[in-house]
Swiss-Prot record:
Keyword tRNA-binding: no
Organism, scientific name: Geobacillus stearothermophilus (Bacillus stearothermophilus)
Subunit annotation: Part of the 50S ribosomal subunit.
PANTHER family in the record: CHLOROPLAST 50S RIBOSOMAL PROTEIN L22-RELATED, LARGE RIBOSOMAL SUBUNIT PROTEIN UL22M
Any Pfam family: Ribosomal_L22
Family: Belongs to the universal ribosomal protein uL22 family.
Name of the protein: Large ribosomal subunit protein uL22
Amino acid sequence: MQAKAVARTVRIAPRKARLVIDLIRGKEVGERFAILRHTPKAASPIIEKVLKSAVANAEHNYDMDVNNLVISQAYVDEGPTLKRFRPRAMGRASAINKRTSHITIVVSEKKEG
């Protein structure tokens, strides 16, 4: 059984969020919270919130044991890009892309044996 949590259109670049997601993929849930709390990246609190939501979904919706959970999938997809312009010299403007992310975390119970 798997429980899933998704944060959509989060205002952080996918490239930066993937750096943090790569640290926690495949580890036990308790260990991941410690890693996220001590990682000085802007994506850490956002990913921690999504992980807490996935654990809560597993506990309340599927009656899974919280101490026996493992992250089976964790990935960041690209969301819609907000296009902005920065004024430049001589009446020109240059584009600024404010990127967003869709963060997905899937937890499942450890296999016995």
